[in-house]
Design a protein with these regions (language model features):
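C-terminal, well-structured catalytic/ligand-binding subdomain of enzymes
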Residues: 4-90, 113, 119-169
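Intrinsically disordered, low-complexity linker/loop segments enriched in Gly/Pro
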Residues: 81-109
Length: 169
């Protein structure tokens, strides 16, 4: 769930996620590798340190939910969401920065996910993302989120209807 500042007492955006994973051991890592410093959730047995949710020193935060109905190609090498989020935390300060980041990534991106992002300036959006494109869902859009929040699980609204997982949630 991502919540805009208009729906919180403090007037700041908020993100809340849970983690569906088969990795039983996780930890919060501190990253200072050039760019913005950040904290990120990583699988403890992952030597590469893919980040599955995190926040950086500017107030930019990111998470994802897997999508199972948005992929529209036959590319086999996938599951780069954690690497994408690690890079985004290093270089993004705002929701607009994240959009530019996605625009400039080489294709295929090797992802099928809904990335939730918030920033310290009130930005709050989901990006339904596959190998070639993304669809932005802005939680500040009163037509889309009249109460100031969006809830996602393991499917994308722009994806194939009644395919995938997560509809019962």
């Amino acid at each position: 769930i991502i919540i805009t500042g208009k729906a919180t007492l403090a007037g700041r955006p908020l993100m809340w996620t849970h983690r569906d994973t088969g990795a039983p051991y996780n930890h919060i890592g501190y990253f200072d590798e050039g760019g913005y410093r950040f904290l990120g959730l990583v699988n403890s047995d992952d030597p590469e340190g893919a980040v599955w949710t995190g926040s950086n020193e500017t107030g930019f935060s990111i998470m994802n939910t897997a999508s199972y109905n948005l992929k529209d190609d036959d590319i086999k090498e996938m599951d780069q969401e954690g690497n994408l989020m690690r890079k985004a935390l290093r270089v993004c300060k705002t929701v607009q920065d994240f959009e530019h980041f996605l625009d400039t990534l080489p294709r295929p991106m090797r992802v099928e996910a809904n990335f939730g992002v918030i920033d310290a300036y009130g930005g709050a959006a989901y990006y339904e993302t596959n190998n070639e494109r993304y669809y932005k869902k802005d939680a500040n859009d009163p037509n889309l989120a009249p109460e100031g929040y969006l809830i996602y699980t393991n499917f994308s609204f722009e994806g194939r209807t009644d395919e995938g997982k997560g509809y019962v949630r």
